[in-house]
Amino acid sequence: MYNGLVHLHSALRWVILILLIVSLIQAFTKNEKLAKTSLWLLISSHIMLLLGLFQYFNSEAVGFHMIERLGGFGNVMKDSFARFWVVEHISVMVIAIILITMARGRAKRLKFSAAAWMYVIALVLILAAVPWPFREGIARPWFPGM
């Protein structure tokens, strides 16, 4: 089951990135379809958050249980692999999803500029916190199961 959740979580990243880029373009071009696109982005990002939180608190490999396994939070912070999964990934992604949620509120009221900048910041945060294949030590494949 855990492998399936990791694959779903990984595949959903592409959906979110595509929707985020489309929403960003719509916000900068003041396209009124942003209200609908931003809703799909909001839904998919919250599903991703729930999947991620489930993995964080239930996985023995990465996440919350790693603190205990490594003998405390101080040891987690010394290990770059553990620090990424226990602190950096979840913190940055939660902030990005908060920004996506706030931008959705702006998009509903057709406040394009505010939504656009929140989407830009969310996109930068997501790109920084994804375990891309070229990131040494924390790499995950481009597509799940590869």
Q: What kind of region is each of these model predictions?
A:
Residues 1-146:
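Membrane-embedded alpha-helical bundles that constitute the cytochrome b-like, heme-associated redox core
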